[in-house]
C-alpha cells in the first residue's frame, strides 16, 4: 500500500520503517527540516535497538522516504497515519494541538479519498473531532470524496519497539466504517501470519483502551512499590513476595517488580491525562490519583536512603549513578527517576559521577552548568564512574550492570555503599563481598552506617 506517516518521532519512525520493511511505499512527513536531512542520510535521532538498520535498508530500497512537505507526503496516499505528540497540558490533560493542527492541514491538502489513522494517544472522542475538522476543510474546498478516520493506538515499549511492532500482542483498530477496518486489517496481516489478534471495535473504545492499558500497568508498579514500603517496615523481602505472587497465573510475572518508580513518555502522561479526563466528567479517580502519588513518592526514596546511610552528612560526598535513562534499551530521559535523584544530590552539594550506556549526552545537555563546574561528570565506563565514590546507586537495570566485577568496584570506592534501586542484586551476596547493601523493600545487609566524609 501507499502510506503517509505524519511525524518522525519515536512512534512515527518505528511505524514508517516497519511498514516499509513489509513492502509498502512509505513517505514520512516531518516539519523539522534538520531532522529530515539527518534521516535521509540514515542517521537516527533516537536510540532504539534494531531501528537504524531497518531504516537504512528501507532507504536503500527506496521504500521509505522523508520529506518536510505534507503535500508531497500525501500524494497518492491510501492510508495516512497521524503520529504526533500529545504532551500533558498545564492541567494534566492531553494537549491535542498537534493532532488537531494536522487535521486542519489534511482538510486543506488532501486530494483523494483515503483512511486517516490516529496512532497518537488521545482522549475519547478525538477521532470524531479529527473527522469533523477534515470534513469541514474538504467542504470549504468543495471536495466530495470520503475520508474515513480510524483509531489505531500503538502499544510499543521503548527498547523493544521494533519487535513489538513486528510481533504484536494485539492490534486494536477502532473504526466506524467496515471497509476502513478491513483495509487496516489487511495492512497489518504480514505481522499476524501465525496468529489473528486484530481487535475491531469502535473508535472511542480503541482510544480508551490505550489509556486503560497504560494506567493498569502503572497501577501494578505502584501497587508493588506500596507493598515494598510495607515490607521494609516489617523485615520482609519484597523479592520473595514477588516470586510468590508471580507464580499465580492470575497475576503473572510482568510489571510486579518493586523499584524507584516509573517514568518515560507514556505512563506518567497517560495516568495524568486519565485523571484529568475523570475530573472533567465529575468522576473521582481515587485509584489513579493514588498510583500517581505513590510513584512520585517512590522517586524520592533513593535520596532518602542515601541520607540515612550518610547520617545526613552530605558535605564532601561523591555518589556514583549507574543508569540515567528511564528504562533499559532507550536514551529517553523523560520523567526518569534518575533525574529526581540527580537534582537532589546537586542541590545538597554532592559530586555526582554517572554512567549510562546511551543517555550520557542527554544528561549533559540538561545540566550544562553542573558539567562545566565538574559537579557532574559523565563516564563511558561504569567502573570509571565509581572511582572514589562514597556510594553507588543503581537506578536503571541495564543488562551490563547485572554481573559486574564487584571486587573491582569495592576496591575503587571510598565507601562500599550500594543502593539498589531495581533490586538487581542479592543482599546476602553483597554483604559477603563487603558492601553495605540497601534495596527497595528489602532488609539492609552489611553494616548499617557509613563513616563521615
Swiss-Prot record:
It catalyses: UDP-alpha-D-glucose + 2 NAD(+) + H2O = UDP-alpha-D-glucuronate + 2 NADH + 3 H(+). The active site is at 266 (nucleophile). It is an enzyme of class 1 (oxidoreductase). InterPro entries: 6-PGluconate_DH-like_C_sf, NAD(P)-bd_dom_sf, UDP-Glc/GDP-Man, UDP-Glc/GDP-Man_DH_C, UDP-Glc/GDP-Man_DH_C_sf, UDP-Glc/GDP-Man_DH_dimer, UDP-Glc/GDP-Man_DH_N, UDPglc_DH_bac. The keyword Transcription does not apply. NAD(+) binds at residues 2-19, 121, 158, 269, 334. One of its GO terms (biological process) is UDP-glucuronate biosynthetic process. GO terms for molecular function: NAD binding; UDP-glucose 6-dehydrogenase activity. Substrate binds at residues 154-158, 210, 214, 255-259, 263, 327. PANTHER family: UDP-GLUCOSE 6-DEHYDROGENASE TUAD. This is UDP-glucose 6-dehydrogenase. The lineage of its organism: Bacteria, Pseudomonadati, Pseudomonadota, Gammaproteobacteria, Pseudomonadales. The gene is udg.
Amino acid at each position: 500500500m501507499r502510506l503517509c506517516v505524519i511525524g518522525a518521532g519515536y512512534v512515527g519512525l518505528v511505524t514508517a520503517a516497519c511498514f516499509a520493511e513489509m513492502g509498502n511505499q512509505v513517505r514520512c512527513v516531518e516539519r523539522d527540516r534538520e531532522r529530515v536531512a539527518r534521516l535521509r542520510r540514515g542517521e537516527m535521532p533516537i536510540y532504539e535497538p534494531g531501528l537504524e538498520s531497518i531504516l537504512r535498508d528501507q532507504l536503500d530500497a527506496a521504500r521509505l522516504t522523508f520529506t518536510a512537505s505534507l503535500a508531497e507526503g500525501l500524494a497518492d496516499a491510501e492510508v495516512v497515519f497521524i503520529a504526533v505528540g500529545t504532551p500533558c497540558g498545564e492541567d494534566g490533560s492531553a494537549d491535542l494541538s498537534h493532532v488537531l493542527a494536522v487535521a486542519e492541514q489534511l482538510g486543506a491538502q488532501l486530494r483523494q479519498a483515503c483512511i486517516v489513522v490516529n496512532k497518537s494517544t488521545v482522549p475519547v472522542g478525538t477521532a470524531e473531532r479529527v473527522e469533523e475538522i477534515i470534513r469541514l476543510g474538504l467542504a470549504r474546498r468543495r471536495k466530495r470524496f470520503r475520508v474515513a478516520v480510524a483509531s489505531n493506538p500503538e502499544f510499543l515499549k521503548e527498547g523493544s519497539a521494533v519487535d513489538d511492532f513486528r510481533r504484536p500482542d494485539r492490534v486494536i483498530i477502532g473504526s466506524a466504517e467496515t471497509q476502513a477496518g478491513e483495509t487496516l486489517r489487511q495492512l497489518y496481516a504480514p505481522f499476524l501470519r501465525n496468529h489473528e489478534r486484530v481487535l475491531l471495535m469502535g473508535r472511542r473504545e480503541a482510544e480508551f483502551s490505550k489509556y486503560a492499558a497504560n494506567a493498569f500497568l502503572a497501577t501494578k508498579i505502584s501497587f508493588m512499590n506500596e507493598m515494598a514500603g510495607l515490607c521494609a517496615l516489617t523485615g520482609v523481602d519484597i523479592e520473595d513476595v514477588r516470586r510468590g505472587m508471580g507464580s499465580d497465573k492470575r497475576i503473572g510475572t510482568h510489571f510486579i517488580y518493586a523499584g524507584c518508580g516509573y517514568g518515560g513518555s507514556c505512563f506518567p502522561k497517560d495516568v495524568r491525562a486519565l485523571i484529568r479526563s475523570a475530573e472533567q466528567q465529575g468522576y473521582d479517580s481515587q485509584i489513579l490519583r493514588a498510583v500517581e502519588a505513590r510513584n512520585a513518592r517512590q522517586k524520592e526514596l533513593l535520596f532518602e536512603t542515601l541520607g540515612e546511610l550518610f547520617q545526613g552528612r552530605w558535605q564532601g560526598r561523591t555518589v556514583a549513578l549507574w543508569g540515567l535513562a528511564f528504562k533499559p534499551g532507550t536514551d529517553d530521559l523523560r520523567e526518569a527517576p534518575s533525574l529526581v535523584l540527580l537534582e537532589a544530590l546537586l542541590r545538597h552539594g554532592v559530586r555526582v559521577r554517572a554512567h549510562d550506556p546511551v543517555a550520557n549526552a542527554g544528561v549533559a545537555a540538561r545540566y550544562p552548568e553542573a558539567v562545566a563546574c565538574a559537579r557532574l561528570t559523565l563516564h563511558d565506563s561504569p567502573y570509571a564512574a565509581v572511582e572514589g565514590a562514597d556510594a553507588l546507586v543503581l537506578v536503571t537495570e541495564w543488562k551490563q550492570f547485572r554481573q559486574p566485577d564487584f571486587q573491582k568496584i569495592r576496591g575503587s570506592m571510598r565507601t562500599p555503599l550500594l543502593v539498589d534501586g531495581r533490586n538487581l542484586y542479592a543482599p546476602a551476596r553483597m554483604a559477603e563481598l563487603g558492601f553495605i547493601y540497601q534495596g527497595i523493600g528489602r532488609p539492609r545487609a552489611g553494616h548499617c552506617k557509613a563513616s563521615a566524609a
